[in-house]
């Protein structure tokens, strides 16, 4: 933003070269000196109007002023007839018209101003509306400051701490997130285990074939993808596989006993399925006729026996394997 001159009034520059001038009672040497002085002043005034100005380390030249096309103010839209005006964001402004759109502070005496989406801001309001803010303390983050990122949130280094114990988390530490709150690994596991104990319906899970939803979020904070199959660690309170890097568990590897409860220190066991006599007879006679039933056949058989399709598939595989083995025995 610069203050530049404007040749709005011809009377402001009294010394201009004329095509013909009359001098009476003045010697030739004096006339020559007067003409040289007038020419020097005229060139000095023109050079001040045409000089280039330096803005933000790049050269910006003042637009040429066409007397036939008046210069208009970008703020009020009126004609600029003042001797001085402001040049900001490649537009001309009255001294009184360049102001912050939020606090209405006149920026005539300010060294800098900021423009965004066609609006002018002072320095304070621009940083208040445009700068990234820490998700924990909600204060602004400068462009030169080191930050920690998790999902779409940005944190100061000192603000990236566990919500429960306030432990500072650094690069490489494993952490979890729930509802945009950051937890260390220990407290995140305790939080997830508590949610599972409150929300899981073991009867419904067994009826649907088992399966536990993926953990909300779990990361080691490095932002890199682990190559190969991630290692798993058994949680002592649940039969859930918590991966060291990414969240989630395999629903095909988890079975819960709906009729038996276990103390927190004991691992859960796979549920053993027991059959009644009429169920065994029905399955045996059915699989003797059809060794490879499709989904529709299994559905009908499940309705007859009262068992799930998953149990029937397991019994089908075991029965088929034993049948094949018997046929391959050497007499």
From Swiss-Prot:
Tell me the superkingdom of the source. Eukaryota
Name the GO terms of the biological process aspect: dorsal spinal cord interneuron anterior axon guidance; negative regulation of DNA-templated transcription; neuron differentiation; regulation of transcription by RNA polymerase II
Where in the cell?
Nucleus
Limits of the LIM zinc-binding domain: 71-132, 133-194
Tell me which residues form the DNA-binding region. 268-327
Q: Which InterPro entries match?
A: HD, Homeodomain-like_sf, LIM_Homeobox_TF, Znf_LIM
- GO MF, any single term: RNA polymerase II transcription regulatory region sequence-specific DNA binding
Q: What is its main location?
A: nucleus
An example of a Pfam family matching this protein is Homeodomain
CDD domains recorded:
homeodomain, LIM1_Lhx2, LIM2_Lhx2_Lhx9
Region described as Disordered: spans on this chain: 253-275
Keywords, comma-separated and alphabetical = DNA-binding, Homeobox, LIM domain, Metal-binding, Nucleus, Repeat, Zinc
Q: State any GO CC term.
A: nucleus
Q: What does this protein do?
A: May be involved in gonadal development.
Could you identify this protein by its name? Answer: LIM/homeobox protein Lhx9
Q: Which gene encodes it?
A: lhx9
